[in-house]
Structure formats: structure tokens, C-alpha cells
């Protein structure tokens, strides 16, 4: 995503990616501390994380805590995926409501990328954003369908929504800055 961003309206856009390996609430604590001591200020802080094997209570609390910490000067965004981040690129290829494990999701993404693009998927694949971004509109529509699907089932907690992701919400803010 960082490579695809461009300056617009002479506003500064800085993307700082910090892979911490931390789980939900520790990730939020890390982000808050980083914001306190960083020389630059941040209007938006996106926390991207998976359900993984973390306790449902922590996974579900993250969104609420992000909202509590957000104020008029800075917004913390909980961009969770259940079961894993790979659901976001998978939704660029197809819609699914099938409950899945992280390995199921990664396998499905690998199949779609191989079949549709002739690309072998592997975790942390460089250039993944550029490969799938042409279908972002379709992915966002599929995310919307998943929201409606889970709402219809009464699944309000993130931990109960499998599959589901909020990763696409980042484009509400950065979309205007993307080249092309």
C-alpha cells in the first residue's frame, strides 16, 4: 500500500508499517506508546490483526478500546480479520460465507491466485496489494455482503464473524491518496 500512495492536496501522507508480532491488546498498547513518543503526529492509526488463537474476549474488546482512545485529533482503527488477513485478498477473487481456519483461508487464496493469475501465493508475498488491488471494488462489495450475512445471523461480536474482515475500511481514508 505504501508504494501506491501519492500526495494529494499538498497534505502529508506517511505510512509507517510496524510488524510487532503482538496480539490484539498488546498491539494497541504498542501503538498508543508509539504515538506518544514519535516525533511525528498521526491522524489515523490502523491496527491490522487476525483472530488467530487469541481469546475471543481480547479480540472483541479491541474495537471498543480503539473507539475509547480515539479523539478529535487521532483515530485508532481496529482492522481485524477472522480468521486471518488472507481473507481480504481472497475476497478480491470470490465471496464465501464458509467458516474457515487460517490455513483453509490461505489455501483458498493460493488456489485463486494460481488459477486466476498464475502466481504462487506465499505468506508475506511482496506486491500482494498491487496484484489484487484492481479488484478492490469487488472485494469491498463482498465485505458488505458478509456484514449483512453476519448481521442476519445475529453475529455482532467480531469473534463470532467467521469469515469477516474490516481491512477494507482503510480505503475510506486512504483511497483518495492512491495513485491511479
Identify the function of each model-found stretch.
Residues 2-17, 25, 31-46, 51-180:
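C-terminal accessory helical subdomains adjacent to catalytic cores in phosphodiester-
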Amino acid at each position: 500500500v505504501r508504494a501506491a500512495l501519492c500526495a494529494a492536496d499538498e497534505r502529508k501522507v506517511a505510512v509507517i508499517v510496524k510488524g510487532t508480532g503482538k496480539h490484539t491488546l498488546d498491539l494497541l498498547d504498542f501503538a498508543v506508546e508509539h504515538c506518544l513518543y514519535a516525533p511525528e503526529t498521526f491522524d489515523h492509526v490502523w491496527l491490522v490483526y487476525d483472530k488467530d488463537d487469541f481469546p475471543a474476549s481480547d479480540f472483541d474488546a479491541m474495537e471498543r478500546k480503539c473507539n475509547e482512545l480515539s479523539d478529535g485529533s487521532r483515530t485508532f482503527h481496529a482492522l481485524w480479520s477472522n480468521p486471518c488477513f488472507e481473507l481480504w485478498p481472497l475476497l478480491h477473487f470470490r465471496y464465501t460465507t464458509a467458516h474457515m481456519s487460517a490455513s483453509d483461508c490461505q489455501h483458498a487464496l493460493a488456489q485463486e491466485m494460481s488459477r486466476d493469475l498464475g502466481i504462487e501465493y506465499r505468506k508475506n508475498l511482496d506486491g500482494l496489494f498491487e496484484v489484487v488491488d484492481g479488484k478492490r471494488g469487488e472485494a469491498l462489495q463482498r465485505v458488505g455482503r458478509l456484514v449483512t450475512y453476519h448481521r442476519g445471523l445475529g453475529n455482532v461480536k467480531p469473534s463470532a464473524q467467521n469469515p469477516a474482515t474490516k481491512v477494507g475500511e482503510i480505503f475510506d481514508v486512504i483511497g483518495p491518496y492512491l495513485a491511479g
